[in-house]
């Protein structure tokens, strides 16, 4: 196997050694964990709540279906899945601070019995093959170092007939709105982050990471190469975000 330790990868618009990205991403989310939900409201003007509602509905929650929620963060997807009638959830995140927030929310909503929590790297899941019905990742894939590996791991742990879902910021498809979107992302958002969270740099990184993430067709191709079948995607809000899905058949 080739030594990739000296390779560089993107971290926003910067490049860093491959081995450093995980640490730097962890620092970002340590910083924003307590205000993560506010951050999502700022980045999407609150529309992320509608996107997540559609995302979970597409997963078709059923009591007999199990969910692995990758980069589960503050628990939004896991809790929505349970509220919609889904079965047991394992919520994972590489960042322990984020999981603590998610656990607290689950306790507040009296749904702690339905969720397991694990600090785990989506690139090397500590799970056996073919063990879950659904795998989800929402606003997390762009922060992973090796996205191809995450997709391969998601497929590995899915049962035959299982389905993978990804909700992520993507490429705006409305050209006339692009100048305003750029100004919002790179001028307004970091300024708001500095004022609300006293953390301009983290919000700057998050805006940059969106632009560096593969576009809709590129991500669909990556999923097919990982072995997913019947891959499709749905644009949300003109392509500001997109839901991708693929089956393990």
Curated annotation (Swiss-Prot):
Task: State which pathway it belongs to.
Answer: Quinol/quinone metabolism; menaquinone biosynthesis; menaquinol from 1,4-dihydroxy-2-naphthoate: step 2/2; Cofactor biosynthesis; ubiquinone biosynthesis
Residues engaged in binding S-adenosyl-L-methionine: 74, 93, 121-122
Key words of the record: Menaquinone biosynthesis, Methyltransferase, S-adenosyl-L-methionine, Transferase, Ubiquinone biosynthesis
Q: Which Pfam families match?
A: Ubie_methyltran
State which Enzyme Commission number(s) the record gives. 2.1.1.163, 2.1.1.201
List, in alphabetical order, the Gene Ontology terms for molecular function in this entry.
2-methoxy-6-polyprenyl-1,4-benzoquinol methyltransferase activity; demethylmenaquinone methyltransferase activity
* Transmembrane residue ranges: none
Q: What InterPro entries does this protein map onto? A: SAM-dependent_MTases_sf (IPR029063), UbiE/COQ5_MeTrFase (IPR004033), UbiE/COQ5_MeTrFase_CS (IPR023576)
- Can you tell which superkingdom this protein's organism belongs to? Bacteria
Catalytic activity entry: a 2-demethylmenaquinol + S-adenosyl-L-methionine = a menaquinol + S-adenosyl-L-homocysteine + H(+); a 2-methoxy-6-(all-trans-polyprenyl)benzene-1,4-diol + S-adenosyl-L-methionine = a 5-methoxy-2-methyl-3-(all-trans-polyprenyl)benzene-1,4-diol + S-adenosyl-L-homocysteine + H(+)
- Give the GO biological process terms: aerobic respiration; menaquinone biosynthetic process; methylation
Q: What does this protein do?
A: Methyltransferase required for the conversion of demethylmenaquinol (DMKH2) to menaquinol (MKH2) and the conversion of 2-polyprenyl-6-methoxy-1,4-benzoquinol (DDMQH2) to 2-polyprenyl-3-methyl-6-methoxy-1,4-benzoquinol (DMQH2).
Q: What family is it from?
A: Belongs to the class I-like SAM-binding methyltransferase superfamily. MenG/UbiE family.
Q: What is this protein called?
A: Ubiquinone/menaquinone biosynthesis C-methyltransferase UbiE
